[in-house]
Amino acid sequence: RYGDGGAYRDPNSPYRSWYDFDSKYKGGYRSWWGFETLPEVNEETPSFVEFITGEGGVIDTWLRRGAAGFRLDVADELPDDFIEKIRTAVKRVSPEKFLLGEVWEDATTKFGFDKRRTYLLGKGLDSVMNYPFKNAVLDFVKGKPAEQAMTEILTICEHYPAPAMDTALNFLSTHDTERALTVIADEPANGRGRAWQSGRCVTGDAYEEGLLRLRMAYAIIYTLPGVPCLYYGDEIAMQGYRDSFNRAFFRWDAHEQRLRPVLAQLAQLRHTCEAFRTGQLRVLRAEDGILHYQRVGKVETAEIIVNRTEHIIVETLASGKSTEVNPMGFTIVVEEVGHNPNHSYYDYV
């Protein structure tokens, strides 16, 4: 099956100690969740650690060839000391190289291997995928009270060290979760099978309302602390439940283009406004269907108002001026710190 050489067939292979061979396992070796194509390795085996983290090893080679960093898939299943050795290898090439981890919960309170994980204590990950923000934002645009959603957001902001918070990966859809529009506008799968999932497609009024809610969600994701990430296809409102429906090919002929200019402007604003990179988050109002917060930087201040209600609201800005925000819309106001110029407005109906 695997030829004459290799750790599977040759007990004297130098790679034999990397794996756990035993007849009790499917296929005769320990694999991830029983998938034979994903054999698990013993991360504490010195020769394996050296192969990955040593000079001239996997990490060293690819970073020196131009990679900017690594994302550790399922970081929960890697021992802390192995993650720390990976970090050492990454930073040995350059302090600017980045180590991101897939962690689904609050990374500062996560338990695994019967102990509290040390992801963000300065010796492990630089930052993590921000699933708590994703959940809070999607829940808010679906109807959760603003005060509850903002409490969840502030909890992460207070728990994470500033460098980790500023570089956290913020998103609404991933290859491991239902697409954002499906979460917002369709009903939960609740364990129903692939045949049911494959036939689902939101249309009509539910689709139009879902699009407005998705737009609000991305306005929040792009303006909160962290680095926004757009999962391919969200810009054309692709739908889909879990794998493989959330990983469908990109629809190059899609007629839905209304989100593109909004996302492009949010990305440009995030790039040009200093407050969105490292600015402090200040909440001015979080009540029912209204979120109103600031990002306060050294040079600029940005003020974000999201109106999930079905009526126009008049909101008082921090400057004392008032502004209208349309139903299912948002407004972003940017001004220089210490000055009183004309405000730069970004309004979305």
Model-found features: residue ranges?
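Substrate-binding/active-site clefts of carbohydrate-active enzymes
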Residues: R1-R65, I86, R92, T109
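Active-site-proximal helices and loops of the catalytic beta/alpha 8
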Residues: G3, V58, A68-A168, I220, ...
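The substrate-binding groove and active-site-proximal loops of carbohydrate-active enzymes
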Residues: F35-E50, A67-E77, A136-K144, S198-E209, ...
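Aromatic-lined glycan-binding groove of carbohydrate-active enzymes
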Residues: M150-R192
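Short acidic/histidine-rich active-site segments
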Residues: L230-I236
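Carbohydrate-binding surface patches
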Residues: R258, L284-L317
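Amphipathic alpha-helical
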Residues: L263-C273, R277
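C-terminal beta-strand-rich structural cap/linker in extracellular carbohydrate-active enzymes
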Residues: S322-V349
